[in-house]
């Protein structure tokens, strides 16, 4: 029996014309992550060191678990994720790695894949009208999020990295003040 999940309703909380301005105020260092992406995209896999650096960039808390993955497994799993044409396999295979949840998997795709992928993060989701992130991510939610972000980036004429920075920054500046008690 198959259960069809309802697509989430994403609604941008700010005007799309503000993307550049918001992204320019983003100050969470991502130069190292972007540099890793420049090396990984043509290689089509992560080394263990690159993997650990991006996992640390996303979440220091999960670092000990991420370090439990051996280099061969990291390379094998990330090669599948970065070379398969199957969208669901791209994201879900990454969660086979210890310490990698959907948000961290999205970081690995965001920086390492040739196609544009957003980073799934509570801040970005909030900027898209989702007050509480799902307790458990699944592919239908992820794919709706990817499609929404790709359309927004295209409509704004920006890269996925610029859109991600803008979504994160808007939440940082507004989420606490706009939350209802």
Q: Residue ranges of each PLM-predicted region?
A:
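N-terminal alpha-helical segment
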Residues: 87-90, 104, 145
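Alpha-helical ds-nucleic-acid-binding substructure associated with the helix-hairpin-helix region
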Residues: 39-96
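C-terminal accessory module of base-excision DNA glycosylases/AP lyases that mediates lesion recognition
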Residues: 1-53, 59, 118-181
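Short hydrophobic alpha-helical segments that form membrane-spanning helices or hydrophobic packing faces
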Residues: 105-110
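Catalytic Zn2+-binding segment of zinc metalloproteases
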Residues: 111-117
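A short glycine-/small-residue-rich loop at the edge of a beta-strand within enzyme catalytic domains
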Residues: 81, 85, 115, 140
